[in-house]
Regions:
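C-terminal structural segment of proteins
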Residues: 1-267
Length: 267
């Protein structure tokens, strides 16, 4: 059970940051996982008054505020068009609409949970995070960092000419995933493939363009590279060996799908 001594609705990012420097204080986010912890919170810091609940699309990027809910993300027409439905596919299995109306992008990215569909999804994009004091860094670098007490302000997704594809394996429709896979094929033929729910946090693999190589051959090559390198673990949802096998299977499917799309668009 979580006990909160004081509640403060921050009036500025500076105030939120100052409050968050005390170890006993916590940023609330969407209060999905935090409320399940057995902790005593000195001051609960609410960011809902700072205008961080919007998605702004420009010609070259998306700016996604930390307080944007997963449901907002799921329903955003611009993101749906840009990712060819990958965002919706990544989010639709997360428990239910009620939870997705509460859970925030910032909470999902800051937590860097191993099972996070959100982290896996954005890892395959040209995505950065903006921290109040730490500035803008790549999501990949942020995912590898230890937890700190900075304030995550927004995600920045740079638009690029690419095709995206998302898959997950689950034991039931809305369960935590056994393994997740997000893939991007860039216009020059290079690939970015993120594998999550290992059950460790998502990792990114990048493959150079190999134009002229048959799709099946390229898919097998990428799948073997991922299988031979990935570190997986076991839990109640699956063994390390099973996850390693799935990583290869999902990588192969992703490459075959994206190569087929590219070939179709070229005809």
């Amino acid at each position: 059970m979580m006990t909160i001594r004081e509640y403060k609705r921050a009036e500025s990012l500076e105030e939120a940051w100052q409050l968050n420097q005390k170890k006993a204080n916590r940023v609330l986010g969407g209060m999905i996982w935090l409320k399940m912890e057995n902790i005593n919170v000195g001051t609960a810091i609410d960011l809902s008054g700072l205008g961080l609940d919007t998605i702004e699309e420009t010609e070259g990027s998306f700016s996604i505020g930390a307080m944007v809910t997963l449901r907002q993300l799921e329903e955003h027409a611009g993101l749906a068009a840009y990712t060819h439905g990958a965002v919706k596919e990544a989010l639709r299995h997360i428990v239910g609409v009620q939870l997705r109306n509460l859970a925030t992008v910032g909470g999902s990215i800051y937590s860097r949970f191993g099972f996070s569909d959100v982290l896996t999804l954005f890892m395959a994009m040209d995505c950065s995070v903006e921290l109040y004091k730490g500035g803008i860094i790549s999501l990949q670098e942020y995912a590898e960092r230890p937890y700190d007490r900075d304030i995550l302000v927004r995600l920045i997704v740079k638009k690029e000419e690419a095709e995206f594809f998302y898959q997950s394996v689950r034991n039931s429709q809305t369960d935590i995933p056994v393994l997740t896979c997000a893939a991007a094929r860039l216009a020059d033929g290079c690939y970015r493939i993120a594998i999550g729910a290992r059950p460790l946090k998502a990792v990114l693999y990048e493959f150079p363009a190999e134009n002229g190589v048959p799709a099946q051959e390229l898919a097998l090559k990428c799948a073997d590279a991922v299988k031979n390198d990935i570190i997986t673990g076991s839990n109640m949802r699956g063994s390390a060996e099973y996850r390693c096998h799935l990583a290869g299977v999902l990588t192969k499917r992703a490459v075959v799908e994206l190569e087929a799309r590219t070939a179709q668009e070229g005809n």
